[in-house]
């Protein structure tokens, strides 16, 4: 059906479509958007990331209705939400659990892209938007910038130390700037993805095999086939999400750290300062380097390295299914290093932990720095002309 045909529909819906082409949008993005037939469990996490972001936005809106920014009011307002606001404890735990859930599904979403080569041409732009989700900047690291660093930190804080001005600025960033940036990046990600089409576990372009009707032979409409699949995945995810939220909201100090249940005291430093668990990888790399400036640079490179994967990978194939043992070995080392660094980042800065972080840091960076060489030398398998359905 063309846009003109949808606009001639009788009644209110036809009137709306004439002014706002809702039918055309739904067809382009859902019913006439063809996705590969062989999506597997790894393709759940994109829709789950969007779901968790919606949970974060709505729970955050309700929290801001009762939260008061300020040195004298912030802690008490959180306690008020937990004890006095009706279902305030539920909203807070929903938001704190959602923060960790968001990074879990985003990391898995990015790992799927690495597995199946979704960053290779023509999907460099969708990959760039997706990899940005994992990037956060610790403000104190600005102090490592030569000459202007200390003054820049003071300007960001708005004071010589953490004060009301700092809390207000961070609150504005957290409530307005970060959500808007994420929404913008997600929209760009989806627009770019629908322009070039989805990748699949085989790394085969379904647009290269079209039927007489001009539609991909190995593709099916996203709706209703994958929307139903995603609804099932959402149901399973929400059961696990609710189990954590109701029975293990702090996840043994991983999701909500114990010191955050104590009022801030500038005269009492916690025994061990740790970042949020999902930044443990980058914090471990930061501590692994003795020099503060070099450590900040190493951490920044560890984040930005994902952006350059489309140009570092010289393999003629996309999917890990058809790559050789060399690439699979480096990928295994990278996964082990990532998990180990995340664990070490939450441990005290003891010499043993710091040394281990340096060892695993080598494994982390070797995956990226040596990629132009081992992907070129690796012996690959023949790639099929059409998608397959093996595990």
Predicted segments with their positions:
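Membrane-embedded and interfacial regions of multi-pass energy-transducing membrane proteins
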Residues: 2-101, 105-391
């Amino acid at each position: 059906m063309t846009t003109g045909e949808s606009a001639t529909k009788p009644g209110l819906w036809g009137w709306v479509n004439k002014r706002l082409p809702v039918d055309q949008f739904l067809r382009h993005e859902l019913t006439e958007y063809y996705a590969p037939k062989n999506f597997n469990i790894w393709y759940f996490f994109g829709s789950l990331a969007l779901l968790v972001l919606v949970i974060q936005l709505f729970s955050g809106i309700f929290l801001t209705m009762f939260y008061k920014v300020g040195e004298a009011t912030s802690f008490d307002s959180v306690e008020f939400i937990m004890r006095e606001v009706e279902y305030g404890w539920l909203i807070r735990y929903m938001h704190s659990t959602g923060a960790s859930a968001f990074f879990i599904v985003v990391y898995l979403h990015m790992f799927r892209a690495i597995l199946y080569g979704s960053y290779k041409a023509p999907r460099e732009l969708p990959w760039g938007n997706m990899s940005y989700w994992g990037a956060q900047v610790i403000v104190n690291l600005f102090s490592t910038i030569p000459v202007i660093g200390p003054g820049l930190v003071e300007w960001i804080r708005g004071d010589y130390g953490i004060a009301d001005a700092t809390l207000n600025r961070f609150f504005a960033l957290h409530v307005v700037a970060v959500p808007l940036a994420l929404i913008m990046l997600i929209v760009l990600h989806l627009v770019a993805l629908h322009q070039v089409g989805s990748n699949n576990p085989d790394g085969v372009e379904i647009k290269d095999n079209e039927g007489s009707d001009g539609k991909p032979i190995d593709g099916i409409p996203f709706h209703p086939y994958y929307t139903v699949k995603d609804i099932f995945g959402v149901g399973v995810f929400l059961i696990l999400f609710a189990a954590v939220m109701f029975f293990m909201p702090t996840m043994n100090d991983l999701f909500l750290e114990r010191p955050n249940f104590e009022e801030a005291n500038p005269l009492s430093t916690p025994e061990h300062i740790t970042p949020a668990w999902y930044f443990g990888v980058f914090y471990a790399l930061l501590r692994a380097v003795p020099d503060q400036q070099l450590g900040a640079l190493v951490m920044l490179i560890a984040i930005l390295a994902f952006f350059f994967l489309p140009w570092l990978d010289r393999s003629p194939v996309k999917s890990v299914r058809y790559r050789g043992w060399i690439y699979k070995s480096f990928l295994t080392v990278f996964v082990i290093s990532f998990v180990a660094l995340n664990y070490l980042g939450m441990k005290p800065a003891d010499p043993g932990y710091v040394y281990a972080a340096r060892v695993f840091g080598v494994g982390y960076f070797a995956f990226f720095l040596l990629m132009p060489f081992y992907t070129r030398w690796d012996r690959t398998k023949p790639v099929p002309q059409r998608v397959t359905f093996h595990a």
